[in-house]
Amino acid sequence: MDKFQGYLEFDGARQQSFLYPLFFREYIYVLAYDHGLNRLNRNRYIFLENADYDKKYSSLITKRLILRMYEQNRLIIPTKDVNQNSFLGHTSLFYYQMISVLFAVIVEIPFSLRLGSSFQGKQLKKSYNLQSIHSIFPFLEDKLGHFNYVLDVLIPYPIHLEILVQTLRYRVKDASSLHFFRFCLYEYCNWKNFYIKKKSILNPRFFLFLYNSHVCEYESIFFFLRKRSSHLRSTSYEVLFERIVFYGKIHHFFKVFVNNFPAILGLLKDPFIHYVRYHGRCILATKDTPLLMNKWKYYFVNLWQCYFSVWFQSQKVNINQLSKDNLEFLGYLSSLRLNPLVVRSQMLENSFLIDNVRIKLDSKIPISSIIGSLAKDKFCNVLGHPISKATWTDSSDSDILNRFVRICRNISHYYSGSSKKKNLYRIKYILRLCCVKTLARKHKSTVRTFLKRLGSGLLEEFLTGEDQVLSLIFPRSYYASKRLYRVRIWYLDILYLNDLVNHE
């Protein structure tokens, strides 16, 4: 990375024109790149000439391949049979795969440098905790309680290939690299039938880069309009002050009206909008009226259709009222719940009760969808009744038990932030009984006979180490009173969601 830093230290006109020397300079033989920013692979790899092509790619071979392709009299035209179209002793699809990976690695360099420069001079302690999926929920608990409407948007993808090329053109000024990128991209589309049949040759890193570039372009337009809209000459909530002088009057309000109008101050300090993007979706939480929410919906539909040339249906943008509707967010069902509080106050001989209502974000487990996923993977039927896992009966007893314990712990770990643990106990019960039925089927016995022979110690593995750790963290009286099961716990080590069955 330090070696390539010099290419990025030119003036603004040449800052992004670095792909050409990286592709064609003779001394580019080894390219070391940090995969820590890539969620698909968090190890550090070095691209060497003799690397294993299944996991690593040689920049030297790729450079030779590019030169050889430019020396050809004609371009490679794909045929119906992938084996008939060979190039340098290998299929052309193999080389398109290798080139696309190296292209994604090179183009990611300015993004990684930009991200690193954004953290310079800032003291971020334990920033790795912010990468956790659960770290989003504590922020939402503080923010969503002040909002009443949420706009749930499904980001459309894919779009036209030429739109992706034009998006990248704003960041890369090298025309040769853009033409080569367009050529490889269209070749990938010509081979799309083979991608469906052979999933092992998919290049998730290349398409992840395209998706991130596409979303970055969309968000840059959205945030620009959002920033401009906050300074328009319009009324602000109930206080009827022009927003153009909104920030200048906040200090005056704190001095004069802090004792008389605390509710108005709360409205003034509320952010205009709260934006969260996750898993190809985004949500916009705001305190606007239904009319303004429909205007935001109309804006998104026209943005995708007019600017990105994508047919975007209005049904993909849902307006949810948090006080009435449930918001499906990262596997949870979130909604606002009124939590009444009664405070007893006593002054000398007089005592009185104060009724307060606190708005709290309630996160629940979507039991129906989880049971549907378990039924799809043959852990239970559609009604939630456990059944034996027939495909696992060929494994050893310890392997079967470890698989069930791992799945049970992962689900318990992720849904520990639920406000109601009753549904979580039901899921654990399904997995425990499914494990017993699977072992009984393997040994050609009934469940009752199998449990009598081995005893109840078989299911002790399902008592996760999580409960043991929590018993050490919280006071013993607190843990013994079972109040811990009503507490929401967010973990900061969940970086990504694994497959339910195939996770090792």
From Swiss-Prot:
GO terms for cellular component: chloroplast. It is found in: Plastid, Chloroplast. Changing residue 3 to Q: In strain: cv. Cvi-1. Keywords: Chloroplast, mRNA processing, Plastid, RNA-binding, tRNA processing. Belongs to the intron maturase 2 family. MatK subfamily. Usually encoded in the trnK tRNA gene intron. Probably assists in splicing its own and other chloroplast group II introns. This is Maturase K. It comes from Arabidopsis thaliana. The lineage of its organism: Eukaryota, Viridiplantae, Streptophyta, Embryophyta, Tracheophyta.
